[in-house]
From Swiss-Prot:
<feature type="region of interest" description="Disordered">
    <location>
        <begin position="503"/>
        <end position="529"/>
    </location>
</feature>
<keyword id="KW-0472">Membrane</keyword>
<protein>
    <recommendedName>
        <fullName>Conserved oligomeric Golgi complex subunit 1</fullName>
    </recommendedName>
</protein>
<feature type="region of interest" description="Disordered">
    <location>
        <begin position="1401"/>
        <end position="1422"/>
    </location>
</feature>
<keyword id="KW-0813">Transport</keyword>
<comment type="similarity">
    <text>Belongs to the COG1 family.</text>
</comment>
<dbReference type="GO" id="GO:0005794">
    <property type="term" value="C:Golgi apparatus"/>
</dbReference>
<dbReference type="GO" id="GO:0000139">
    <property type="term" value="C:Golgi membrane"/>
</dbReference>
<dbReference type="GO" id="GO:0015031">
    <property type="term" value="P:protein transport"/>
</dbReference>
<comment type="function">
    <text>Required for normal Golgi function.</text>
</comment>
<feature type="compositionally biased region" description="Low complexity">
    <location>
        <begin position="1401"/>
        <end position="1414"/>
    </location>
</feature>
<feature type="compositionally biased region" description="Low complexity">
    <location>
        <begin position="930"/>
        <end position="960"/>
    </location>
</feature>
<dbReference type="GO" id="GO:0017119">
    <property type="term" value="C:Golgi transport complex"/>
</dbReference>
<comment type="subunit">
    <text>Component of the conserved oligomeric Golgi complex which is composed of eight different subunits and is required for normal Golgi morphology and localization.</text>
</comment>
<keyword id="KW-0653">Protein transport</keyword>
<feature type="region of interest" description="Disordered">
    <location>
        <begin position="916"/>
        <end position="960"/>
    </location>
</feature>
<keyword id="KW-0333">Golgi apparatus</keyword>
Length: 1449
């Protein structure tokens, strides 16, 4: 309560002081109503006859120290005037009040008073007395309301004024009591003096009494000054705390403590009696005891407050706040130093680097560097010790022996503490010296070794400015050298010892504090010297303070700030940086801030111009621009100590040429961090941000979305490559031909163009950042061209040197940037392959859940999407392999200018041509000097499992050795794309092969294999049997019929067999449909592994179909039957010999198309241990894709089976659960057996197909099979030669060629049957068989075409026109003996046209109805609509028909 009352009373006296004008001097002190302080107390303590007081100015000085120096001499308290004087003073005060009232009235203008009088007169004239009473009552009530409102307002908002007024009332009562006691004392003293004078004897006794009275009077006057100081000083301390003047607070508190100890330890009875009556002194001291705690809290708050308030704060305020911690909280120098660092760190992160700031990052970083610079500068001038102290002050002029004698004034206990401290300090310094002397082999030197390597010279320390500041409250000027904190402690020591003078102008000095009691010096030292002992201990610690501790702790402080900044705030400040261009601009600005470390510290003055005034003005103008160096106040203050007298200037050292201290040097001295350290730190920050920008840029490139968007816009030429192949592009025919050659559809080209543009945009963005590595020095010529004076030219040259020196320090790590790009590209590509694979898996799993009505549409969409994904995957990974620089694989040439010259703009046509030229083949080694043949080149490509026979290398790839290493590093990600391509193709192949195989199965089961009339449309062959003098009778059933006599050229020693003219139409349609599906993929770029898998899928499907067809057949003399069970229905299929012959021919024809000469029809042939490489898939990536597909299919089958089993379990009873488990086990066993069979079959596809043929051959008689075998082989060779071009997709692997044979005819002139088969008859005269005449057929030989390395053969318009003209002029008449066979052949050839297998039956019926209406020339005429079908397969059909007609001719 006492503390709060003093606080409130102080605020009240402030308001009163604003109205005070002056205090008159003279005999009595007249205090006005608005005077400062307690009126009664001032009337009692200051009515002493003295000289006039100095007037108080109206400025903002609130110090009460004027009362301490109010007079030069004081009279005794016996001269205090009596109560009459007090009453006189009171009456004079009342008169003064009335005079003030009259003055206020005189200030009102006369016209206003006249106006008021006239208004009152008019008011009384116009209103009755009752109305006047009502008006009076109304006005009085309003006044009362206003009074109550005013009371509430004052009570709520101005409570401190009310409390202050209450305190004033209490003080009035206490002063009245004091005045009464003093008046009583005065009367008694008068009586005593009268008695003493009455009994005085002699002149000597009178002189002694007079001297004694003077001494007592002097002591009482000193006592009155002390009391006045102690009563008024709390208000001053409060004002100093409010203005953060902690240095003044400490001075006042130490002085108050010293004075209080002087008063309380006084042995004079008169003074003790006076002190017992002045209880306010004790109360004031009790309230002042709280100031240390309050000051500590305020000083810490000041150190940790926001930067907006401490910008421009003078350094003396920091000195006062830090010295408060040493003085009041008893902290050591190290603890104070740590507290300073912690406070600076909190200010930095709470204000400058706060997350709530909205300043640009450039301003934030600039303020951070400025803050760090000022912090290092404060450490340098406040804490950094000097090895040799020069004597600047008076108390340092004494020799060292006198300084050692000061220890006698310190107590024994404290001397023991100091001696122990010094011994420990010596041990510590000796250990440091031993550590520094030992040499270490480590790469990183210790802090001590760093300091030894770069010691601070005395010249550099002398460059630090001398602090020269003036305290307006103390009215003193201080001149301190660094470290300033040590000088401050010395001043506190002098204050605590009472070594200061009381004066009014600062010129007169005197030691009056020793006169109050000359007999108790020891007790005073014991009571008031505790603070001086603590300060002495701190000074000793400061003298032995090691700079290595500053070095180490400051270095840790800088590292902690940088680490917190990197971990917590970098992302916040750099969140708005979205591109490398913005990052490059920010990087250049921040590096400019760091390069300022080369500049000289602006507070430093070189020794040559070491002037006290110039150094002081520089530090005060820069460090504290808001504080004025000259004080305008004139209030009296406590003067400085002997150590801070201005009459002892600092000696100027001898000028020596010394390099000025730069910020870089100061940082290296204090913390060992220089410009390179901050450059490396921010370089790491920029690298982290660059990585974040790269990751964000690549994450925005969603390859899966681009793929899906392009798929939603694909056209027919994208779905079917054959349509795109024959499409003529008028805009860019050259590029169109290149794309067709490389198998690139418009959608593929659009995909590559988009991703190339996006990737090049990323590269172009980072060009701005990487171009900083090639920054030239600042153009010196431009700066030198300025015709300025010499000083400006020197400054320009200096700045240019500073900015050009660290050129090598600001290079960004380009290798890491490239690695980040490579890593991000791998990540995006991995996400693309994963999402695409998941999409294919989803299509497979959802396909079976489609409804029956939408099955066809959904299946087509699914196949189109899967085919599109597989095509795109292959084009993509081929493009990556051929362009490693473009796709970040080659870290050395990612930013090659040849690849990104036009990166900032969209792709031009020429640029896209360069990119897409080399898609078809991976990079090949350069050719040897001796050119290899095409066959050798093709053999090399086959060994590498490449489906392309192109030996062209990519023009972009120049260094093949480096590219091979690059491809090895990036092989896993390329393999993923390749596996995705294989996976899509596997799904696509299984889909369309399964669909067409199902149709073929239906055709096979619906076909009449027991038709005995089929031989009417077959070709007849007569086989002559040699008799050797004996007749050989053959069974008609075995040879197809024998005659005893010669009938139609057939004698009794010959046999007739029939061979079909061509294969079954559904077999041709089956192969044609699959060939059309394959043509959707460019044959030029299709992978051989895909063709092998198509053949494998066809073989497995045929094996299952034929096995089901012949599994239950039974052979008889006439026919055999086969039972098919499907959907609980049984179909009986009957076979005769001709049916088996037809099925055998069809299967052998398919086998020869698929495998060529590798097919072995012998049933005893076993599978080879090492299958042929043409049909076996050895690629491990393909096997991975196939295993994944099988796992997805098994998952789907298991899900379907589980659903069916759940439905059955709900319907069935609990008794049937065991049966269901048995069934499940059986199903699993069957599935495992089927999988094992399929694996065994897939290991050797040729052997599997031979097993299919073996199934049919088992149902034929071996003798019949021996008769038919040679003719079947000849038929298959001829048919294969005709359809070689049609089914080139299958022939592409084995490339088997059948040599053409000559036709044979009978001498009798009878024409042989069509299709160039051989017929024989006997020779006239019975001389045996004559040699038949042969006729050469003009069959085209495609052997040379297959041996070439051409990707595909395009037929010119002239060639096609010649072929169609030959067909148009071909004869249409044929012999009558073969008209039926020709008609059948024409019907079958119409069936073999490239039509859709699904609509096969409808088209077959239409063709049979229109056979007689259409002729062959009209179908193949150039003007016919069918001749304009732009498919490669149908062109092959036309060629085969032409070959058939020429052969028949």
């Amino acid at each position: 309560m006492a503390f709060n009352q003093m606080r409130s009373s102080g605020s009240t006296t402030d308001l009163n002081r604003l109205n005070s004008s002056s205090i008159s001097g003279g005999g009595n002190i007249n205090i006005s109503n608005g005077g400062y302080g307690n009126q009664q107390l001032n009337a009692i303590l200051s009515p002493i006859k003295s000289s006039s007081l100095s007037s108080m100015s109206n400025s903002s000085s609130y110090s009460n120290l004027n009362t301490l120096s109010s007079s030069k001499s004081f009279n005794s308290l016996t001269l205090i005037e009596n109560q009459n004087d007090t009453t006189t003073t009171t009456s004079t005060n009342n008169g003064a009040i009335s005079e003030q009232y009259q003055q206020l009235l005189s200030m009102i203008p006369k016209y206003q008073t006249k106006q008021y009088e006239s208004d009152v007169k008019i008011l009384f004239e116009r209103n009755t007395p009752e109305q006047m009473k009502q008006m009076e009552f109304k006005k009085r009530s309003e006044i009362e309301d206003m009074k109550s409102q005013l009371r509430n307002l004052i009570g709520n908002k101005y409570r401190d004024l009310v409390e202050g007024s209450d305190a004033i009332v209490k003080m009035k009562k206490s002063t009245e009591l004091i005045s009464d006691n003093l008046s009583l004392m005065q009367s008694e003293l008068k009586q005593f003096s009268e008695k003493r004078n009455h009994f005085r004897k002699g002149v000597s006794q009178d002189n002694l009494k007079l001297n004694k009275e003077k001494e007592i009077q002097k002591k009482i006057s000193i006592f009155s000054k002390y009391c006045k100081f102690l009563i008024d000083i709390p208000e001053v301390i409060w004002r100093s705390l409010d203005s953060n003047d902690y240095f003044e607070v400490c001075v006042f508190f130490l002085k108050s403590k010293y004075l209080y100890s002087k008063i309380t330890n006084e042995n004079n009875l008169e003074i003790k009696r006076l002190l017992s009556k002045l209880t306010i002194i004790e109360k004031q001291w009790i309230s002042m005891k709280q100031f240390p705690i309050k000051t500590i809290g305020y000083s810490k708050l000041f150190l940790n407050e926001s930067t907006s308030r401490i910008i421009g704060t003078p350094i003396e305020k920091y000195i006062g706040s830090l010295s408060t911690l040493i003085l009041f909280e008893k902290k050591s120098i190290k603890e104070t130093f740590n507290e300073f660092l912690l406070s600076r760190r909190s200010v930095l992160f709470n204000s400058i680097l706060s997350k709530d700031t909205n300043r640009p990052i450039q301003q934030t970083i600039e303020k951070m560097f400025q803050f760090l610079k000022m912090s290092i500068y404060y450490i340098m001038v406040l804490f950094y010790p000097r090895k040799y102290q020069t004597n600047n002050n008076n108390n340092n002029d004494q020799p060292e022996e006198e300084e050692q004698d000061d220890e006698k004034l310190i107590s024994n206990d404290y001397q023991s503490k100091i001696s122990k401290f010094k011994s420990n300090l010596q041990q510590y310094t000796s250990s440091l010296s031993s550590m520094s002397s030992t040499t270490t082999t480590t790469n990183s030197p210790t802090f001590e070794s760093k300091m030894i390597n770069k010691p601070v010279s005395e010249k550099e320390l002398n460059q630090l400015p001398t602090l020269n500041f003036t305290s307006s409250i103390l009215e003193s000027t201080f001149n301190w050298r660094s470290p300033y904190l040590k000088e401050c402690l010395k001043f506190y020591k002098d204050v605590s010892n009472g070594e200061l003078s009381i004066n009014s102008s600062g010129s007169q000095q005197g030691d009056d504090y020793q006169d109050i009691n000359t007999n108790n010096n020891n007790s005073n030292n014991n009571n008031s010297g505790i603070d001086s002992q603590d300060i002495e201990y701190s000074l000793i610690e400061f003298d032995n303070f090691n700079s290595n501790f500053i070095f180490k702790r400051t270095s840790e402080w800088i590292e902690e700030i940088i680490e917190d900044f990197k971990l917590n705030l970098v992302q916040k400040f750099l969140i708005d940086i979205k591109s490398a261009k913005e990052l490059s601009s920010l990087r250049s600005e921040i590096f400019d801030f760091i390069l300022d470390f080369k500049n000289i510290v602006p507070f430093i003055q070189p020794p040559q111009t070491n002037s006290l005034s110039s150094s002081n003005s520089s530090i005060n103008s820069i460090a504290s621009p808001s504080v004025s160096l000259t004080s305008s106040t004139s209030s009296p203050i406590i003067a400085t100590t002997k150590a801070t007298v201005l009459t002892t200037p600092t000696p100027t050292p001898t000028p020596t040429p010394t390099t000025p201290i730069s910020w870089n040097r100061m940082f290296s001295i204090i913390c060992g961090k220089d410009m390179k350290y901050f450059l490396n730190i921010f370089e790491d920050i920029f690298l982290v941000k660059s990585e974040s920008i790269i990751m964000d840029s690549f994450s925005r490139i969603n390859l899966s979305k681009i793929q899906s968007d392009i798929f939603s816009q694909i056209k027919s030429e994208d779905k079917n490559f054959s349509e795109f192949l024959w499409f003529y592009n008028q805009d860019d025919p050259i590029q169109s031909i290149k794309n067709k050659t490389n198998g690139i559809t418009p959608s593929n080209e659009l995909f590559l163009t988009k991703i190339n543009q996006l990737y090049n945009n990323i590269k172009s963005d980072f060009i701005y950042l990487l171009n900083d590595n090639n920054i030239n020095n600042i153009n010196i010529n431009n700066n030198n061209n300025n015709n300025n004076n010499n000083n400006n030219n020197n400054n320009n040259n200096r700045s240019m040197i500073i900015t050009s020196q660290p050129k090598n320090l600001i290079k960004i790590n380009e290798i890491l940037i490239k690695e980040y790009m490579k890593k991000s590209f791998y990540k995006s590509l991995n996400e693309f392959t994963t999402s695409t694979q998941d999409r294919i898996d989803q299509l497979i799993l959802l396909n079976k859940n489609k409804t029956t009505s939408g099955t066809t549409t959904s299946t087509n969409l699914k196949k189109d999407e899967i085919l599109f994904i597989s095509k795109l995957s292959k084009i993509f990974y081929k493009h990556i392999v051929n362009n490693p620089n473009l796709y970040f694989l080659n870290s050395l040439n990612i930013f090659d200018t040849t690849n990104i010259s036009n990166c900032s703009t969209s792709f031009s046509k020429s640029n896209s041509i360069n990119i897409l030229d080399t898609i078809s083949s991976p990079p090949q080694p350069p050719p040897s000097p001796t050119h290899s043949s095409p066959s050798i080149q093709r053999h090399t490509n086959n060994n590498n499992n490449n489906n392309n026979n192109n030996n062209n290398t990519s023009p972009i790839i120049n260094n093949n050795n480096n590219n091979s290493e690059i491809l090895k590093e990036s092989l896993p990600i390329i393999d993923k794309l390749k596996q995705q391509f294989y996976y899509g193709c596997i799904v696509w192949v299984n889909e369309f092969v399964g669909d067409y195989s199902q149709i073929l199965k239906q055709d096979l089961f619906n076909h009449d294999w027991n038709d005995s009339d089929r031989i009417k449309t077959w070709e007849k062959h007569i086989i002559q049997i040699e008799s050797n003098g004996h007749n050989h009778n053959n069974d008609a059933n075995d040879g197809g019929g024998d005659d005893d006599a010669t009938v139609n050229g057939v004698n009794e020693h010959s046999t007739i067999i029939y061979i079909p003219y061509q294969t079954s139409p559904f077999i041709t349609s089956y192969l044609m449909s699959i060939s059309l599906e394959i043509s959707k993929f460019s044959l030029n770029t299709i992978d051989k592994n895909i063709l092998r898998f198509i053949i494998e899928s066809i073989t497995l499907n045929l094996f299952n179909i034929v096995n089901d067809l012949l599994s239950t057949s039974s052979t008889s003399t006439t026919a055999s039957t086969s039972n098919l069970t499907s959907n609980n229905t049984t179909t009986t299929i009957k076979f005769n010999k001709e049916g088996y012959i037809q099925l055998l021919i069809d299967l052998k024809y398919i086998g020869f198309i698929l495998f060529g000469r590798e097919l072995n029809s012998s049933s005893s042939k076993k599978p080879t241990s090492q299958p042929t490489s043409n049909v076996i898939i050895k690629d491990s990536i393909f096997k991975k894709a196939k295993s994944h597909y099988q796992s997805i299919i098994s998952t789907k089958n298991n899900v379907d089976e589980n659903i069916e089993l759940q439905k059955q379990q709900q319907q069935q009873q609990q008794q049937q659960q065991q049966q269901q488990q048995q069934q499940q086990q059986q199903q699993q066993q069957q599935q495992q057996q089927q999988q094992q069979q399929q694996e065994q079959l897939s290991n050797n596809i040729v052997y599997t197909f031979n097993q299919i043929i073996e199934l049919v051959e088992k149902n034929l008689d071996p003798i019949d099979l021996a008769f038919y075998n040679s003719y079947i082989v000849k038929f298959i060779d001829q048919t294969y030669s005709k359809t070689l071009t049609l089914f080139g997709n299958f022939v592409y692997l084995h490339k088997s060629i059948v040599k053409p044979e000559k036709k044979q005819s009978i001498n009798g002139g009878q024409q042989s049957p069509p299709l160039a088969t051989t017929s024989s008859n006997g020779i006239s005269g019975g001389k045996g068989i004559q040699q038949q005449q042969q006729q050469q057929s003009d069959l085209p030989n495609p052997m040379q075409l297959l041996k070439t390395n051409t990707k595909f053969q395009l037929f010119s318009i002239d060639t096609i026109q010649t072929i169609t003209d030959a067909i148009a002029t071909a004869p249409t008449t044929i012999p009558s003996s073969t008209s039926n066979s020709i008609q059948s052949s024409a019907n079958n050839s119409a069936i073999a046209s490239p039509i859709s297998t699904i609509d096969y039956r409808n088209q077959q019926q239409q063709q049979q109805n229109n056979t007689n209406q259409q002729s062959l020339p009209s179908i193949l005429s150039p003007t016919s609509a069918s001749s304009t079908i732009n498919t490669f397969s149908f062109m092959g059909k036309k060629i085969s028909d032409l070959m058939y007609n020429t052969t028949k001719k």
